[in-house]
Regions:
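DNA polymerase processivity clamps
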Residues: 1-8, 15-70, 85-200
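Glycine-rich, pocket-lining loop/helix-strand segments that form or immediately flank
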Residues: 73
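Short, flexible active-site loops
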Residues: 76-87
Length: 200
């Protein structure tokens, strides 16, 4: 989490000696991701992780990574993931991604906002920039709830869409001022994402 977004991912583990909670530095996570995606042994997808009060050691067939842990207690993240949200948007992942990419043409380092206008059968996307340029797009969707408008950081939405593996995605809202819950469109998603809204 960075205060604007939060991700939760769960995976199956075997041979657990105990359950530990720790905070791993971002640099260590990035290095693990690089090794597992680039140099993974095709015959084994297993990784062994050991944790004590100060360090983490991760081992694959060919690599060992050791990292110091971040001291402190991680916030109670499960309270951030709400349930029974009244506004539910379902749409095709690739259509949504393409529309966001078209909107991103007008974005810059200083401005990356996009406004989503939610209706029963369509999602309208709008973006503007300081040069008074404006982009608009519309895609089909299924939406349950009162019509509403909410703004988000384009880059944050695209990053989440890129890692969701199902054909469709779900966005769930309470109000336009609270975080959006993004998941795959299945009954028991193993990964969940919260993105906070922004003014656009």
């Amino acid at each position: 989490t960075d205060g604007h977004r939060l991700a939760l991912s769960e995976t199956e583990a075997t041979d657990l000696n105990s359950i530990s909670t720790c905070i791993i530095p971002r640099k260590c996570i990035s290095e693990l991701k690089r090794i597992l995606t680039t140099y993974s042994d095709e015959n084994s997808n297993l990784i062994t992780i050991g944790v004590n009060s100060r360090n983490l050691v991760a081992k694959t067939n060919n690599y060992v990574i050791k990292s110091k842990l971040i001291e402190g207690k991680y916030p109670d993240y499960r309270k951030v993931f709400p349930e029974n949200l009244p506004h539910v948007l379902k749409l095709n992942k690739n259509n949504f991604k393409s529309a966001l990419q078209r909107m991103s043409i007008l974005s810059s380092e200083q401005y990356k906002g996009v406004k989503l206008s939610l209706n029963a059968t369509s999602l309208d996307l709008t973006t503007t920039n300081p040069q008074q340029e404006k982009g608009e797009d519309k895609i089909d969707c299924s939406y349950t709830g009162e019509p509403m408008e909410v703004g988000f950081n384009l880059a944050y939405l695209l990053e989440v869409i890129d890692v969701i593996e199902t054909d469709n995605v779900q966005l769930r809202f309470d109000t336009q001022d609270t975080g959006c819950l993004l998941t795959s469109d299945d009954n028991s998603p193993t990964s969940k994402y919260i993105i906070m809204p922004m003014r656009v």
